[in-house]
Amino acid sequence: MFLSLPMLTVLIPLVSLAGLFYSASVEDDFPQGCTSTTSLCFYSLLLPITIPVYVFFHLWTWMGIKLFRHN
């Protein structure tokens, strides 16, 4: 399988971080201008937090199913 789970766990945060650096280089008022939801900068700050948290809880749920299925 080309996109395995360990590869995605590393690849998704790196892509999110690249998006964060891209918006930091494009936006003139990067830290202060990120408060509006219409700004691209807002979502580039939201993605690096949302995606790893989603992956963590997805893996946590999967581990819970794997552990408690055997009892």
UniProtKB/Swiss-Prot annotation:
It holds the Pfam family PIG-Y. Part of the glycosylphosphatidylinositol-N-acetylglucosaminyltransferase (GPI-GnT) complex that catalyzes the transfer of N-acetylglucosamine from UDP-N-acetylglucosamine to phosphatidylinositol and participates in the first step of GPI biosynthesis. May act by regulating the catalytic subunit PIGA. Signal peptide: none annotated. PREY is derived from the same bicistronic transcript that encodes these 2 different proteins. This is Phosphatidylinositol N-acetylglucosaminyltransferase subunit Y. Pathway: Glycolipid biosynthesis; glycosylphosphatidylinositol-anchor biosynthesis. Residues 1-3, 66-71 are cytoplasmic. One of its GO terms (biological process) is GPI anchor biosynthetic process. GO terms for cellular component: glycosylphosphatidylinositol-N-acetylglucosaminyltransferase (GPI-GnT) complex. It comes from Bos taurus. The gene is PIGY.
